[in-house]
């Protein structure tokens, strides 16, 4: 293969990867059939991103959407399904395809995560956020899916598809119950203060609960960092003032001795 051909091939791969990530897909790593990313603020407000296949939204949440992969997703209909007094939809992406299924991404602002279960697509979860023993505690329990016995259709699922819930947290994490789906050992906090709970799609369809609990500091990392920065800056200013004062005092003494 010539150098020019290699460059062209690499360019195509990079464009494909960029397009997939822009649409919410994951070019590298695990692939998910349904995932929620919750960016939580200390006051209970949040930003929430849902990436999901249309068949998953129909089967898991009972949303009235067209599962035909040849049909473009009705983005206005998706927006209407997620819009509510508690949520403000910022964007519904263009759909993309994977394994013969169409996927879509929905980005929204959540006014109060504690009321999110009043929104139909999230009514399978119960949310709480409060303070216990000088810590802020977030809990989410994801319950039964909308799938009814005898209604399951063949969407090309092979049984290994995954569902994920990720929390992007504002404060230092003290304790959590996230576990690795493969080893069943406690998961480490990911870079960016992120925790993930994963489950097989088959288990989610069966309604096996996902129990989420996180204990964290009451103050946000940003707030703590700003205070540390302010303290360090104040200490530096005081040190500089001290050096200047000592220098001026030494100069005054030398001048007095000379005279």
Residue spans for each PLM region:
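Bacterial N-terminal signal peptides that target proteins for export
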Residues: 1-10
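Structured domain cores in non-transmembrane regions
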Residues: 53-133, 138
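A mature extracytoplasmic/lumenal domain signature
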Residues: 38, 50-54, 110-112, 169, ...
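C-terminal motif of bacterial Sec signal peptides marking the signal peptidase cleavage site
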Residues: 19-22
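Intrinsically disordered, low-complexity linkers and stems that provide flexible hinges
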Residues: 132-233
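Bacterial signal peptide processing site
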Residues: 24-27
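Post-signal peptide N-terminal segment of mature Sec-exported envelope proteins
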Residues: 31-51
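C-terminal single-pass membrane-anchor helix
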Residues: 218-259
């Amino acid at each position: 293969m010539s150098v020019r051909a290699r460059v062209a091939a690499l360019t195509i791969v990079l464009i494909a990867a960029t397009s997939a990530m822009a649409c919410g897909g994951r070019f590298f790593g695990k692939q998910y059939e349904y995932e929620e990313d919750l960016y939580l603020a200390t006051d209970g407000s949040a930003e929430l991103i849902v990436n999901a296949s249309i068949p998953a939204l129909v089967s898991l949440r009972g949303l009235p959407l067209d599962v035909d992969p040849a049909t473009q997703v009705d983005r206005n209909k998706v927006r209407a399904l997620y819009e509510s007094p508690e949520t403000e939809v910022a964007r519904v992406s263009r759909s993309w395809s994977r394994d013969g299924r169409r996927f879509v991404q929905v980005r929204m602002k959540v006014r109060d995560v504690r009321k999110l279960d009043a929104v139909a697509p999230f009514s399978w979860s119960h949310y709480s956020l409060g303070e216990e023993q000088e810590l802020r505690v977030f809990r989410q329990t994801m319950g039964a899916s909308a799938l009814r016995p005898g209604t399951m259709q063949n969407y090309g699922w092979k049984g290994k598809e995954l569902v994920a819930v990720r929390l992007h947290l504002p404060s230092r994490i003290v304790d959590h119950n996230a576990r690795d789906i493969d080893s069943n050992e406690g998961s480490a906090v990911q870079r960016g203060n992120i925790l993930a709970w994963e489950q097989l799609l088959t288990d989610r369809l069966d309604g096996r609960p996902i129990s989420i609990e996180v204990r964290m500091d009451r103050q946000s990392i940003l707030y703590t960092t700003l205070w540390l920065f302010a303290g360090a800056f104040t200490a530096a200013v005081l040190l500089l003032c001290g050096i200047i004062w000592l220098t001026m005092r030494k100069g005054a003494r030398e001048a007095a001795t000379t005279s």
